[in-house]
Amino acid sequence: MAFDYKKEYKALYQPPCTPHLITVPSMTFAAVRGQGDPNDPAGEYKAAVELLYGLLYTIKMSKKGSYRMEGYFDFVVPPLEGLWEQTGAEKENFRWTSLLRLPEFVTRKEFDWAVREATAKKKKDFSRVEFFTYDEGLCVQCMHLGSYDDEPETLARMNAFAAEQGYAVDFSETRFHHELYLSDPNRTAPEKRKTILRHPLKSSL
């Protein structure tokens, strides 16, 4: 049976709808950085997501080819994630990093092979996809149910909870507003979408 990160790491992928603290371990991702409106069907964001899934499925399906990855195990491709820089409300100015978690057996060597393999087989340039390590640390987290545009209400509850616990949001050049998308927006009504929200924290004392 394929390893499913959502089921094996429920604290990370199936949190409650109430704000809570969590320490997120260091993980490696396939990542694409960009700027622009994520809702633009012809925009940079959509292209980035297609690259990420193309690379992850190249890794997943390597079991059917001649290349052998040491320690390989079959896996369910984890949920799409996004790191968002706080640059105002205009969506065309959003700066983001789109992410898909990599299985632990994917080293830099295996990642570089997958980039070359995907580029050759799919006739598309995958060189924009980065091998990215993110050590998120202490965060406040909450499951948001509903439209992406309604996130501010959930974020306000999260930040208020963090303040009650003696913490403040800690955005920086290396720590960001973080979203994990458990619902396909093309197949799920806005009011039924599930999105995990995370904010990095520091002590306010």
Label each residue range with its predicted role.
Residues 1-205:
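A solvent-exposed interaction/effector surface
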